[in-house]
Amino acid sequence: MRLVFAGTPAVAVPSLTALAARFEVAAVITREDAPLGRKRILTPSPVAIAAEELGLSVIRANRLREEAIERVRVLRPDVGVVVAYGGLVHEPLLSLPRRGWVNLHFSLLPRWRGAAPVQHALIAGDRETGAAVFQLVPELDAGDVFGELRRLIRPDETAGELLDDLARSGARLLADTVAALADGTAVATPQSGEPVAAPKLGIADAKLDLTRPADEVYARFRGVTPEPGAWALLDGERFKIHAVRPTAAGVLPPGAVVADGKRILAGTGSRPLELVTVQPAGKRVMAAADWWRGAGGEAVLS
């Protein structure tokens, strides 16, 4: 089975590695090198780095347009595979591979179609999630499903932790699906149920509303960690919150911050949450207790 792979971030690397171990990867499509860090140094994507380490041909393209399409046409792949590429596959590229394109998506479709399925699952308080491999069609994440895996969501799991786990287990599912396509045993089933959208999250979505119950605040914290990154306002500036814990402490006014022994607690609409690691505006990441001492023992988050 000769394939073309399209992916960009680190979560796509396990899939590329699994596929390269079992099939001929004719080329890897990934987004162009991007400036990163304070010095804005042009940096290859994690998939580009992995592909070059595997000795694979790399096509860098932020949009799958004429040049990328022509390069894929020449390769004559049997199938195209997409894992978090960061762009849509349109015609005529969609029909170029003999078996079309398949996509590894990190949710149980049709729930959470879109760019941020793991984040939305956590924010919504879902107890179960998974990954699915489906046939790519023009409608977003709407194709027939070849296979899926299911798993429970741990109560303290962040989006980053859950996504890393699904990336590993999903890679095995994806490679097995491509093998089934190769030997003619793959069977796809139409999606069943009401679709739910999972659009990309922005900075505004990561703000914690401390007037809401603690369970809701904690669910949003987990869903936006590590990206876009949870925050609240402190003296009108963005106060980043890198780690929190649920508590059974007594009720505090929403946003009120107090010390309780060695713990730093922040009030919500129900029980407080413990602030563990924070980052005040313009400062480094630090333990909440260190920040509290420097703040003079008085702060209100909003």
Swiss-Prot record:
Protein family per UniProt: Belongs to the Fmt family.
SUPFAM superfamilies for this protein: FMT C-terminal domain-like, Formyltransferase
Residues that coordinate or bind (6S)-5,6,7,8-tetrahydrofolate: S107, L108, L109, P110
HAMAP family: Formyl_trans
Class of the enzyme per the UniProt entry, highest EC level: transferase
Lineage, top ranks: Bacteria, Bacillati, Actinomycetota, Actinomycetes, Micrococcales
EC annotation from Swiss-Prot or TrEMBL: 2.1.2.9
Name this protein carries in UniProt: Methionyl-tRNA formyltransferase
UniProt KW Transferase keyword: yes
GO cellular component: a single term: cytosol
Organism, scientific name: Leifsonia xyli subsp. xyli (strain CTCB07)
InterPro entries the UniProt entry points to: Fmt, Formyl_trans_C, Formyl_transf_N, Formyl_transf_N_sf, Formyl_transferase-like_C_sf, Met-tRNA-FMT_C, Met-tRNA-FMT_N
Keywords, ordered alphabetically: Protein biosynthesis, Transferase
GO molecular function, one term: methionyl-tRNA formyltransferase activity
Pfam families: Formyl_trans_C (PF02911), Formyl_trans_N (PF00551)
Function: Attaches a formyl group to the free amino group of methionyl-tRNA(fMet). The formyl group appears to play a dual role in the initiator identity of N-formylmethionyl-tRNA by promoting its recognition by IF2 and preventing the misappropriation of this tRNA by the elongation apparatus.
Catalysed reaction, written as an equation: L-methionyl-tRNA(fMet) + (6R)-10-formyltetrahydrofolate = N-formyl-L-methionyl-tRNA(fMet) + (6S)-5,6,7,8-tetrahydrofolate + H(+)
